Every structure is written in structure tokens, then in C-alpha cells.
Amino acid sequence: MSITPYSTYHLIKSQDLNHHGTLYAGRCADWFVESGFIAACSLAKSEHIVCLKIHGLLFSKPAHLGDILCFESKVVLAGRTSLISHVQVIKDGQPMLDGFITFIHVDLKGKPQPHNIIITATRPEDLDLQKKARQLRP
């Protein structure tokens, strides 16, 4: 399968702010995982996908009330039972955060189950993301 990007958008409202008046990191982490999950569920049924690990969130700039954030996600690497999504958050056309999330494909009892998905990267940026994702695996 080729790498397909998915975009979701969020408007920052007053209930999304922290005590500094900027986007609460926990709210952003929630949206971040949701975006990666959507990409993973494009390849497998949602009832078979669980989150294993978020691989770092580094905020390069703050987000404020009224900002609209674009979460661009794509599955860049597939293991035997794992799917690794890359998520980039964009504000005003500029990246403000990115990271990886590992999801596991499970059976209905929650045990890891092979998914038989093969991801093929062709674009240089996707090949680079695949290389970084491989370094995250134990």
C-alpha cells in the first residue's frame, strides 16, 4: 500500500486553553493521537487498533485562542502487528509539532494479531519518515 495522508482540523476554543492562555498540551495530545488513529484505521478496522506508544511531542511554537490547527497523519511503517503513524501539526502553514505513534493490531480479545499490511514509501520525505520510524522499534 502506498502512504496516504489524512488531514483533520481543530479550532482552538477557550476550553482548550491552559492557565497561560495557550493551547493545553493535553488537549493537543488528544487530537494528535486521534489523528494518528484515523490514519491507522484507514488500513484496519478500528476495533482492532490500540495505541501502544506516543514517541515524543515537541512543541516548536504555541497556539492561541482562535487558531486553526491542521493535523496531517499517515501510516509510514508496518511491522507484523504494528502500524506507526507520523503526525505533523501545522499552524498558519508552518509546522508547530510532529511525532510518531505506534499502534498495535489486536484480535477481539486484545491480543496482538498480524495484519498483513505492507507499506510502500516512494517519496523522499516518506522514505525519511520510514527510516526514523524504524529507529523507534525495539
How would you describe each model-predicted region?
Residues 9-13, 58, 102:
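Generic structural detector for well-ordered beta-strands
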Residues 6, 64-65, 76-138:
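HotDog/MaoC-like acyl-thioester-processing domains
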Residues 33-34:
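A eukaryote-biased signal for short, well-structured alpha-helical docking elements
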Residues 1-25, 132-138:
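Catalytic strand-loop segment that frames the active site of acyl-thioester-processing enzymes
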Residues 3, 37-72, 76-84, 94-99:
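Hydrophobic beta-strand-centered segment that forms part of the acyl-chain substrate-binding groove
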